[in-house]
Amino acid sequence: MITVNEGSVTIRVPDFSKVSARAPVFYNPAMEFNRDVSVVALQVFQRLLGGEISVADTFSGSGIRAIRYLVEVEGVSEAFANDINPLAVECIKNNSVINSVSPEVSREDASIFLRSNHGRFDVIDIDPFGTPAPFMDSAAASARNNSLLAVTATDTSSLCGTYIKPCLRKYSSRPLKTEYCHETGLRILAGFTAMNLARYRKAASVLLSHSSQHYMRLYIRVRRGARRADESIRNIGFMLHCFRCLHHEHVNGFAPLKRECPHCGAEMDVAGPLWVGDIQDSKFIGEMIGEVENKELNTAGDVLKLLKGCLDEAGMPPGFYDIHEVCSKLGRSAPPLRDVMDGLEAAGFRVSRTHIRPTGIRTDAGIGEIEEVLAGLMPE
């Protein structure tokens, strides 16, 4: 056994040489950053609701997430730590004693656990090893009004378009391997979640989304009501991408046809259905930024960097342009990113960086306007 200190808690887990779903008890040290962000997000959400909240950790493993929520998030009155692995259940109980907390510990399949506790939780956290897709229907059915659904997906090769058929099977959506494929993956996951919620007359609004390391993470507020659900799914649509000139655009609705690129005339490829609405909530993220300094986080600097990047992206159109990719298509060397952004702003366009790729920019300018700015910065 080894001792792990994370946030304000200490746990003991079996020694491991490689993170794997086959490990006796699943604990991934690389996900500390994920859990740090989650602690901050839950604190802000708790204050948004006011009063005490109940939290479900559906794939608890060592219990680290549920225990941290109890210890570090003010207002968490109860936390449920569930895992189907009997060794994990014993580990959760032992780690709870170490930290002087008492989560409700259960050993059930995640879907059964959620359905047997219908409407009980203010926060449902789904952080499996792999895809969350098989559990999303149960999560959608169980989510109470005005609750938070926090979802992790580590099957990024499917969501990003390396393997198209698995994404079609799991998420009923076609991915596309572009420079912004990680954003497309986030939007596929958000759209899939929203459609699952809509079946139960519940609406989704994305508070925060990020693609980090080997996973994608969403924080979605759930509201009940058929009218709200109808409004929510108006954010479902498709991304269209031209691989010849890198033009991209999005359309709302469920039946787009491949069409001619308005910039170069080539046929565009399609990704979706997916979420084309906002994937960052500026107010929620702003409050998270203010909360970071109140928490004991080993990755506080990285958390702040991520949140500030996500805040910059709020309200910007779907997709982004990798300036190095654009310049490569043009056969030119890339100028400093700041110069490109300044040029676009001077031309009257909105522009921001993206947390997903350091050489990417978000803007409401089209590829033609970007090429004009680049031409001014890099004369022949």
UniProtKB/Swiss-Prot annotation:
The gene is trm1. GO terms for biological process: tRNA N2-guanine methylation. It is an enzyme of class 2 (transferase). SUPFAM superfamilies: S-adenosyl-L-methionine-dependent methyltransferases. It comes from Methanothermobacter thermautotrophicus (strain ATCC 29096 / DSM 1053 / JCM 10044 / NBRC 100330 / Delta H) (Methanobacterium thermoautotrophicum). This is tRNA (guanine(26)-N(2))-dimethyltransferase. Belongs to the class I-like SAM-binding methyltransferase superfamily. Trm1 family. The keyword Cell inner membrane does not apply. It catalyses: guanosine(26) in tRNA + 2 S-adenosyl-L-methionine = N(2)-dimethylguanosine(26) in tRNA + 2 S-adenosyl-L-homocysteine + 2 H(+).
